[in-house]
């Protein structure tokens, strides 16, 4: 069962970078009542993900971004606070995305060290292969990801809220925001998107 204190922890973690947003401000006006309601909804399995907003970013390439409501972001942080420490125990050291103490700068620094080592201090040729996964997020098979995460939680997570965490992970992963969202950008020509990376926006 999820308790108020752990939901409060997720709320405080969530608002660190979102406190100035309208959604965060509205939630904060009655945050105790709102957190109690959110906690009760999770425990009774009545929680449902709200409408996301969808907008287009143009740099470094055209892509759609879905942003959840503030209360849904609290749930995301609730999940992340439990899974991130476990992921850190199994991730390869060369995984740099979305990890504390890693990121782009750490990745570039490691790459420079690798090039220096492979080229024997820049005295020999060394080759670098740059690759990308086309339409990565759009092509994820949600059911397979949900099972992988559920198996991971069952094996590694030991908290009293294990069943709640399993339920929330499945709910969030299987959610399809493109079916219920508010558009915040004008339509964009399909040709501007990389192949496989459009779900909502297209000029009709």
Which residues make up each language-model segment?
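Conserved polymerase palm-domain catalytic core
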Residues: 41, 114, 118-204
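Conserved, non-catalytic sequence blocks in retroelement Pol enzymes and Pol-derived host proteins
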Residues: 27, 99-100, 157-161
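Active-site-proximal segment of RNA-dependent polymerases
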Residues: 80-142
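Active-site-flanking structural segment that lines cofactor/substrate pockets
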Residues: 33-62
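Conserved pre-motif C helix in the palm subdomain of viral-like polymerases
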Residues: 62-92, 137, 181-204
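Short, compositionally biased low-complexity segments
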Residues: 2-16, 49-53, 80-86, 119, ...
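Non-catalytic, polymerase-adjacent accessory regions of viral genome-replication enzymes
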Residues: 1-36
């Amino acid at each position: 069962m999820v308790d108020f204190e752990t939901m409060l922890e997720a709320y405080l973690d969530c608002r660190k970078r979102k406190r100035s947003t309208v959604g965060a401000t509205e939630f904060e006006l009655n945050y105790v009542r709102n957190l109690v309601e959110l906690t009760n909804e999770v425990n009774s399995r009545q929680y449902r993900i709200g409408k996301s907003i969808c907008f287009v970013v143009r740099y470094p390439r055209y892509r759609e971004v879905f942003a959840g409501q503030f209360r849904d972001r609290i749930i995301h942080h609730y999940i992340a606070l439990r899974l991130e420490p476990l992921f850190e125990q199994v991730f390869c050291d060369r995984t740099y995305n979305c990890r504390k103490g890693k990121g782009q700068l750490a990745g570039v620094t490691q790459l420079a060290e690798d090039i220096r080592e492979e080229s024997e201090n820049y005295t020999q040729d060394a080759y670098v292969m740059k690759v990308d996964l086309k339409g990565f997020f759009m092509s994820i098979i949600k059911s397979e990801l949900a099972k992988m995460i559920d198996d991971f939680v069952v094996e590694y997570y030991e908290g009293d809220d294990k069943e709640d965490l399993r339920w929330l992970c499945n709910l969030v992963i299987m959610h399809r925001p493109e079916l219920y969202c508010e558009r915040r950008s004008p339509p964009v020509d399909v040709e501007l998107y990389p192949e496989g990376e459009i779900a909502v926006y297209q000029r009709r």
